Amino acid sequence: MEELGDRLATLGWVSDLFVGGSVATDDYTPRISDIDLVALVDGPVDTARQSTLMTLHRALDDGIAADLKLGCVYVEDAQLLDLRAVHPTWTHGSLVDRILSGVARAELVRYGYAVLGRSPLDVLPVMSDDDVREAARAELTGYWTWAARRPWLWLDPVIADLGLTSMARGRHTLATGELLTKTQAVECAAGPAWLVDQLRARRRGEHVPSPRVRAALIAWRDARRTVARAQH
């Protein structure tokens, strides 16, 4: 993270670099968790800037950041408060366009810190418990509602695992206004004990597969229930 901050600082158009996600919440598991970063830039990330960022990230991914799953959202400072704006995002070896979700913003405000520049609290508004609830509701009624309508997606073990923990996190946040880490979410997953044990093992980095169809059905049904409740 520090190396990325140093390299971005030399570009002259990146002012801040924030750490969010599992690193900020002290829930990071090497080679399992992603490293979620957010950078602020002084203007649009045009084609030339995108090329620069891709070259920079590929060099890191091939070197010091190999296997670290380092990702970064590049947010134009003028669009920082626009929840619908999409931003160039380096993730898993590619530059794609994504929003900076309300939940990601809540993690930054409540737990995030700066590697470069200002504190997240200096540039992002404070989020109340109700604000965080609405951020969680937006994720459940957005992407996860879309996914719940496509049962075949859940045959992917990655989606099944992510769905179970995301539903647990969403339910907890709607009820309390507080954020839940992925490790904590495993303990709250709506699955039988054998599946929770397997989720726990995978979170520790162990290669413990689950029965593909059974896990998919459990996760999909949980998502259907959870997103339906989030609509009301």
Residue ranges and their predicted role:
Residues M1-F18, A48-Q50, Q231-H232:
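Helical scaffold of the NTase/Pol beta-like nucleotidyltransferase catalytic core
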Residues M54-L155, L164:
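Conserved NTP/Mg2+-binding pocket subregion across the NTase superfamily
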Residues E3-L4, T52-A59, D222:
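Long, highly charged amphipathic alpha-helices
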Residues A24-T25, Q79, R169-H172:
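Short, solvent-exposed loop/turn segments at secondary-structure junctions
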Residues A114-H232:
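Nucleotidyltransferase catalytic cores
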Residues A9, R58-D61, A228:
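A general structural signal for alpha-helical elements within enzymatic catalytic domains
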Residues G21-H57, K69-V73:
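Catalytic metal-binding acidic patch
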